[in-house]
Amino acid sequence: MKWVKVTASVILLSLSGCGSEHLSHSHDHHAQAHHIANAAVLISEGETKIMFDPLPLSGFGVYPETPQSDIAQMMAGEGNYAGIDAVFISHAHSDHFSAAAIIAYMNAQPDVTLVAPRQALDMMKKDQDWDGVLQARMRIVDMEAGDAAETITIGDITATAVRIPHAGWPAPKRAAIQNMVYRVTLNDDATVIHMGDADPRRQHFIPHKEHWDETRTDTAFPPYWFLTSSQGSYILSDEMNVEKSIGVHVPLEIPQELKDSGQDYFSKSGETREINVERSPE
């Protein structure tokens, strides 16, 4: 081992620099977003972990699907998927949700809480492997568009759910879908939003302005079409009080308009982003 001699003044200077750096960043915190596939995202902050839409039935050849290796790790509770606290389902469309897969996952991971719309529960109840005992570990949101936000608390996780119409509204089949926008705060620290397949029209978001203003969102995960329109971008930054957005639900063939937008988005399984949380000193 080589020993390097340094003067006392250098040591003091180094310590001084470290101290000032520590002070300048003492109110910066970090969480991480891990892209699973399509609209599926894993969020971790310390020991707290949540997933959004992790087990879709199919991508229908249009959207990327959750890799089989990731599914195996989820079921085993290994790797990135060890210690998951809660799973949030945005809506009961097959490119976001599989009743059979979620039932299997809940049976394999008995400590996980599921947050889902009523329509997802209805589909699970029709599955041959449904067991009513699972419902005790579920938080079901059943609301109409325009209803006030509902608050859900799971340990160190505080979430709200707001029903925002599915893209394609007001077509009846789209309007009937319970599409949930979740705002989730982990450990009273990092706050994220997942939007499912929300329709990008301001009229859906304006009635909830007070709700959005209550909490600054560090990172939102909107469907990519919010990032390719001026109205969608305005909704995120000005209506929803979002600091940063990362697009999801990106097709296998990435739209050129998204490539040209300069916006950040997830398109490959395993991509990660740091979620920077900046809070003012108290």
PLM features: what roles do these ranges have?
Residues 48-88, 100-102, 199-215:
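Pre-active-site segment of Zn-dependent metallo-hydrolases
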Residues 39, 58-59, 93-97, 121-124, ...:
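Active-site environment of divalent metal-dependent phosphoester hydrolases
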Residues 52-55, 84-95, 115-118, 193-198, ...:
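Active-site neighborhood of phospho(di)ester-bond hydrolases with catalytic His/Asp-centered motifs
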Residues 165-239:
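Active-site-proximal loop/helix segments of hydrolase catalytic cores
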Residues 2-9:
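Sec-dependent signal peptide recognition
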Residues 13-67:
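Zn-dependent metallo-beta-lactamase
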Residues 75-145:
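Active-site HxH/HxHxD metal-binding segment of metal-dependent hydrolases
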Residues 128-155, 234-282:
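Binuclear metal-ion centers of metallo-dependent hydrolases, dominated by the metallo-beta-lactamase
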